Amino acid sequence: MTIEDLPDIPLEGSSLIGRYPFLFTGSDTSVIFSISAAPMPSDCEFSFFDPNDASCQEILFDPKTSVSELFAILRQWVPQVQQNIDIIGNEILKRGCNVNDRDGLTDMTLLHYTCKSGAHGIGDIETAVKFAAQLIDLGADASLRSRWTNMNALHYASYFDVPELIRVILKTSKPKDVDATCSDFNFGTALHIAAHNLCAGAVKTLLELGANPAFRNDKGQIPAEVVPDPVDMPLEMADAAAIAKEIKQMLLDAVPLPCTSAKAVLPNSDHTTSRAMLTSLGLKLGDRVVIAGQKVGTLRFCGTTEFASGQWAGIELDEPEGKNNGSVGRVQYFKCAPKYGIFAPLSKISKLKDGRKTTTHTPSTRATPHARSQKVDVAHFTSRVNSGLTTSKKETASESTLTLPPSEEPKTVAENDAAQPGSMSSSSSSSSLDHKQSYPKKLTTSSGGKKTLSKSPSLPSRASAGLKSSATSAANNSHHEGALHLGERVLVVGQRVGTIKFFGTTNFAPGYWYGIELEKPHGKNDGSVGGVQYFSCSPRYGIFAPPSRVQRLSDSLDTLSEISSNKQNHSYPGFRRSFSTTSASSQKEINRRNAFAKTKTTLRRSWSSSTTAGGLEGTVKLHEGSQVLLTSSNEMATVRYVGPTDFASGIWLGLELRSAKGKNDGAVGDKRYFTCKPNYGVLVRPSRVTYRGISGSKLIDENC
């Protein structure tokens, strides 16, 4: 049924609805408005509707502008529209729209759009909260769902991390509504949605308002188990890794302790299930195991615990890196020396292999007790600092090496002492530093069956096994036939040029790091961090980077451009809240999110395979004249230049802003890239702008 099919209904006044004489009072019938494109002024210089523009205001307040056209305006994911949700929404109501009527393209109501408009960095939270309260007073039904996403208002508010809207919605809802499920998220609750998208504010508010932290989705996962694993996040997402740790701990703390009458013999309870779990993993008590590829010890306990639900493993570590003596909360699960005991989920442990030096770098397919992301063989990760563990691998002809000066002392490491370490600290500084790539080593086999490893003279007490070559990706490996040497010029993160001065382990973070002296003062130190001098250079000329971020400098500008465009932006669909629904791309966007939620294999694969707005980036490229959004200031700008620059490597965008908030007139130094008014120009990386919700780094022609 459409608006044109409605019969004439006599209007009745009321104290609240009297402000909107066209509302259908006394009728719960809602309609779905036909699909329309957003109206735009004929002389408009930009590609979106701006309610603050005079010509756009004429269209907005024109009674001839239809409800379908106003819904089309609401679909535009730009601050100018989302921050004026109340103005546009009231115009929709004034044109005779029922408060629960839906947009024909997205099947969303005004309340759904309002929950979206509270998103940080795009909308205005205060405006969204006031308008949501107004809609609920007018009779908006918070339980209505979009038939495309199956999400209700609470789900949208949780997805976009708007705690204030969550409180408004649940204030008038039934207690059970807080745990309403959504099929698009494996029939998880709003708490699952917030946890999966790292919405800390939403998680905290939902828990305060009675959300069930032990609710299991269709995959048997509680909210704590859908939090992305920090080990699968790239280095530039260290902040997200810290948030993930905080959210997971918050959810685990909220899970009620299991009430059983056999607490005194808790370590022996559920013995059959524990034995079955161990058997499926090929383990038994007393086996040597590795925890998340990081710590090595002996399996002493397996079963349920008082401190958390599910099956847990108790391990006695080889080194005093644990947290207890086998007891937690006055319950003794096993016995060991203080600081040698640690507990871990069964999904985080694996049997310590004897032939680890020949371990291949392929995803492990061992069974896990919960449906989780596919785990990766951790033999190639670097051990935690001060763990005393070293890694030994079989040397292959194709592996490149980093050659150190002959004056360095060799360090001998027995093969039997080699371990399978891996950095899985949840802190913000240790999120998957090695990017799950193999970094070959230079090994010299001795007659005694041992291998000697060269160590860095800059830090003789800390450099241990495993000097690694820089292998940024499979694509880049093809032209990394030679080794990276101390003193060689390299490109750091695809942006900064410098010379390698140091390679080895450090005190400030686990893993192996390059110390690089930059050619320009764009660094962060003088070669020292935390009072430890790793190499010497001028202040602000020194920088440290993991091997995955260092690339041999090529004389080809095309190669530099390719490196820059490939490395400067990594996105994770779970964190993207663009949710853009513009015109024909809406259904493709929904299909994209469905496919990610239902068929996700590994989070690592997601970093590089995410798409938005129905793959629009595959057909649209930024060019001179394109209108983009500068995300750092929420300012619209016009692209005036696309290409390389003299001051830094890679592709840059020259933007002309609409106000004098820039830094130049299109010239930097002695080189002019474009022309505009003084302080109206700025040059930025493509990743700093978006075009219709798509990152500019995805819309750059590699042949620029």
From Swiss-Prot:
Q: Name one GO cellular component term.
A: intracellular membrane-bounded organelle
UniProt keyword annotation of Secreted present: no
**CAP-Gly domain boundaries:** 303-345, 504-546, 643-685
Instruction: Mark out the compositionally biased spans (Low complexity).
Output: 360-371, 423-432, 440-461
Looking up SUPFAM superfamilies in the UniProt record yields: Ankyrin repeat (SSF48403), Cap-Gly domain (SSF74924)
Q: Could you tell me which InterPro entries the record lists for this protein?
A: Ankyrin_rpt, Ankyrin_rpt-contain_sf, CAP-Gly_dom_sf, CAP-Gly_domain
- Where does the source fall among the domains of life? Eukaryota
Output the SMART domains linked to this UniProt entry.
Answer: ANK, CAP_GLY
Please state what the protein is called: CAP-Gly domain-containing linker protein 4
Q: Which PROSITE patterns match?
A: ANK_REP_REGION (PS50297), ANK_REPEAT (PS50088), CAP_GLY_1 (PS00845), CAP_GLY_2 (PS50245)
Q: Which UniProt keywords apply?
A: ANK repeat, Phosphoprotein, Repeat
According to its UniProt entry, this protein's organism is Mus musculus
Intrachain disulfide bonds: none
| Region named Disordered | 353-479
